[in-house]
Amino acid sequence: MEKAPPLLDLAALDIFRTVAAEGSVTRAAERLSRVQSNVTTRVRQLEADLGTPLFLREGKRMALTPEGKVLLGYADRLLALAEEARQALQPGPPAGRLRLGSMESTAASRLPAPLARLHSQWPGVALELTTAATRVLVERLRAHALDAVLVAWPPGQPADPALETLPVFTEELLLVLPAGHPHAAGPDQVQPGTLAVFEPGCTYRRIAQEWFAPRRQPMQLLELGSYHAILASVAGGGCAGIVPRSVLSISPHAALLSQEPITTITTLLTWRQGYRSAALDAPQQVLVD
C-alpha cells in the first residue's frame, strides 16, 4: 500500500510564512522567538515533505521559488481558517488578531476615534491596519490575507455574494479646485486640465474619471500616493482633484481651495461570507455607534 504524504503542519506553515515575509532566517527566528537552527530545520523538513524547494538561498537572503509563492497563498488561507476556528470555539468578548484593511482616506479621517475606542474597550484585540485602494483590499480579503476591509464599491457594481457588508460611513465627494476658481457647472469649466488621482483600483479615482468623461478635452492624470499630496498639488494651482469632505475637513489646505459637491458614496465594512471571529465583532460595534 502506497504511503500517504505527510499532512501539512500549521506550525511549519507559520514558520514558512514568516521567513517569506522577512526574507531571512535570522529575522524570522527573532520574530518567532525561536533559534535559527530550528527555523532552518522546519523549513527544510517542509521542503522535504512537499518534494520541492520553497526558497532560493542567496547568501543570507531567502527568496520564494515559484512553488513557494503558490504555497504562500495556501498558507495564508489555512492559517486564517485555523485562527477563525480557534476563535469560534472560544466565545467571549472581542479578542484575537484582526487584520483590517482600509482606504487611505478612511484611515486618515474616519478611523482615529473608533480605533481609540476599540483599543480602550477591547485591549485583547490585536489590530493590524493596512491601507490600499479598494480593488487591492478586496483581492487581499478574498485571498484570506485580510479579515475585513473598509471599501467603497464603484456605483452600479453588483453585490458580491461571496462577501458580507455593513454600511458604516457616508462620504460626500467634492471637486476641489485652486483658490479663486469660478463655479464649475460641469467638467468643461474646470481649469487647469490636469486631474490628481490615486492609483488604479481606487473607487474615487473611477468616479472622478467618469465625472470628467464628457469633457471635450480629456483631463491629463497626475498619479499621487496620498491625499495630502493631492490637496497640496491642487492648492499649488497645478491641478484639480476629487476627495471626500471628511478628508478636506482635516487638511491644512482646506482654506486654499474652492470646492463643488459631486456625489455621495457609502463606505462598507466588508468580510467574507460566513466568516466569524470574536475580533471582528469589535469594529462592527465601534464603527456603527
Locate each region found by the language model.
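Short helix-boundary/capping micro-motifs
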Residues: 17-35
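A short LG(V/I)-centered, amphipathic sequence patch enriched
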Residues: 45-64
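Alpha-helical linker/hinge and terminal dimerization helices associated
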Residues: 49-50, 71-92
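Interdomain hinge and pocket-entrance segments immediately C-terminal to HTH DNA-binding domains
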Residues: 60, 66, 89-107, 121-126, ...
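Central regulatory/effector-binding core of bacterial HTH transcription factors
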Residues: 95-158
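Hydrophobic hinge/microswitch elements
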Residues: 133-138, 142-146, 152, 201-257
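Secondary-structure junction motif
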Residues: 183, 193-215, 277-281
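A late-sequence structural motif
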Residues: 256-289
